[in-house]
Design a protein with these regions (language model features):
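Conserved catalytic core of the tyrosine transesterase superfamily
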Residues: 1-295
């Protein structure tokens, strides 16, 4: 099945122009499925609907993956087999008419403004890494960028004079997001002092660098933000998307309109942004129940 996987990845890269993170996710899903087939000595051309359903059940029950993740795996398999129908003359797509598990709608967690303030105060700005980390956290909260967008920023993406950052999001769509005073100040300090120290005489277009003077990876940033979350004693595992959720929720709490928040987040569909209005409703209910005498 390896040759089919390679052909498919090449197709989504060259023909569809999917982002490298999407390519990696597709490859991981397919490599795992290939091991499942190898254990049963089944070729890709021999996969049936029943076998696909069996695999999904295994992911849910044995590997304890959540319904949303399993649904994403099914999309990967459906696209892969549809490619084989056209490219390898497969008779039919075994994933057609296979329904994924129903995902329960859970509202994303958000930090309070006080929790964000506590988090942003953690980096030691007297040190090289602290200046960098302070700038990254400030920019992440100021813009609501995805972590992949943040780590892919180049120096020229920042316009300090006009106060905005340009990024490229999902599907290669470019957008411009404003930067607040705190983020601009942290960036200025980082660029003037910390980044030069990290470069160690080398040159790089990437905005945020690791200790080798190279582009900071998503995984590297996850470790950094997780460590600061534990240090701030926030009480929940701190992941980069938590600041993105907090960014959107805090804007709406202060009267921002949904369409503007959608544009800043880079959502193609406003229904994706509307999840944050549900968070506000839940928060209002909590406040009411805690403080109203007849709640």
């Amino acid at each position: 099945m390896q040759s089919e996987i390679s052909s498919f990845i090449n197709y989504i890269t060259v023909e569809q122009g999917l982002a490298s993170n999407t390519q990696s996710a597709y490859r991981r899903d397919l490599e795992t499925f290939a091991k499942f087939l190898d254990a049963r000595k089944v070729q890709a051309s021999e996969v049936s609907r029943e076998l696909v359903r069996e695999y999904l059940v295994e992911l849910l029950q044995d590997r304890k993956l959540n319904a949303r993740t399993v649904g994403r795996v099914l999309v990967t398999l459906r696209n892969f087999f549809q490619f084989l129908v056209f490219d390898r003359d497969l008779c039919e797509n075994p994933c057609l008419n296979v329904e994924g598990p129903k995902a329960t709608k859970t509202l994303p967690k958000v930090l309070s403004v006080n929790q964000v303030d506590e988090l942003l105060s953690q980096p030691d700005v007297t040190k090289t890494y602290g200046l960098r980390d302070k700038a990254m956290l400030e920019v992440l909260y100021a813009t609501g960028l995805r972590v992949s967008e943040l780590t892919s920023l180049e120096v020229q993406a920042v316009n300090s004079d006009l106060g905005y950052v340009s990024c490229v999001g999902k599907g290669g769509k470019a957008r411009v997001v404003p930067l607040g005073r705190s983020a601009l100040s942290a960036l200025e300090s980082y660029l003037r002092h910390s980044r030069l120290a990290l470069l160690k005489g080398k040159t790089s277009n990437w905005l945020f660098l690791n200790r080798h003077g190279e582009k900071l990876t998503r995984q590297g940033f996850w470790k950094i933000i997780g460590a600061y979350g534990r240090k701030a004693q926030i009480g929940i595992p701190l992941k980069p998307h938590l600041l993105r959720h907090s960014f959107a929720t805090h804007l709406l709490q202060r009267g921002a309109d949904l369409r503007s928040v959608q544009m800043m987040l880079g959502h193609s569909d406003i229904s994706t942004t509307q999840i944050y209005t549900h968070i506000l409703k839940e928060r209002l209910r909590e406040i009411y129940e805690q403080h109203h005498p007849r709640s």
